[in-house]
Amino acid sequence: PQYDYEILFIDNDSTDSTRVKLRAICEKNHKIKAIFNAKNFGQFNSPYYGILQTTGDCTIPVCADFQDPIELIPKLVAKWEEGFKIVCAVKTKSKENPIMYFLRSCYYKLIKKMSSVEQIEQFTGFGLYDKSFVQVLRDLKDPIPFIRGIVGELGFKRTEIEYTQPQRRAGKTHNNFYTLYDAAMLSFTSYTKIGLRLATFVGAFSGFASVIIAIVYFIMKLMYWDRFQAGMVPLILLVCFIGSLQLLFIGLMGEYILSMNKRLMNRPLVVEEERINFDEKEIETK
């Protein structure tokens, strides 16, 4: 073979027989390594941490559900050999639930429109990363990393390869509305300013409109004192509308503050319970 290799599994606190099987595989082949997390640290932190632990000239992260086709690896390496530091695998089609694929497509387009940093549509993180990029990731020390945004932000020489995403081969996803919302808010608060700017603009517009309406109301009342009766219903609707806007933007600001708070706490990406087939010289990066 032209290249040597290492295979690193990072287990996010599986509750089945995954760890038993990984130990058996690692025992047979010392080029296969494993990290067992002390708990489930989420769909972003765990694979990101795994990337930081690799030692090769390049790294290719692959999800264990086989929705990232390993058949693309030779094509990824070929593009890397051409001089690209990052090779992004981008979905053009997917065999997953069509409704979910449509919603994800809308999400990608929305974030791309709102973000101040270039965002790659239908990029899940599957691809190839040169060791120079991986070293920059280590230096970032981001406690809540979003690899899809970081790729577009740092400006390394990059290309894309298209593929059709197959169905999940085994197991069942643990993603639900909360985890998907959490992922969306991570990208939204990390790479967009529109939430805060929108609150400012809507507040200014509402204030200006309120002054105009008040002046018009006052003039109409002076001109038609007995006949002009606005009643309570418009006032109640206006108060409810303004109150809902306030709650919406307070919630958005809360999401930004939560993101800042997590970064300031600077907690480790993951906490390891065990690692297998790592040399003592290999420094753990958290």
Language-model segments: residues:
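Conserved donor nucleotide-binding strand/loop of the catalytic core
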Residues: 5-8, 19-53
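Hydrophobic helical membrane-anchoring modules
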Residues: 146-286
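Acceptor/aglycone-binding surface of glycosyltransferases and processive sugar-polymer synthases
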Residues: 37-39, 43-53, 58, 70-145, ...
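A conserved acidic beta->alpha catalytic loop
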Residues: 11-20, 66-67
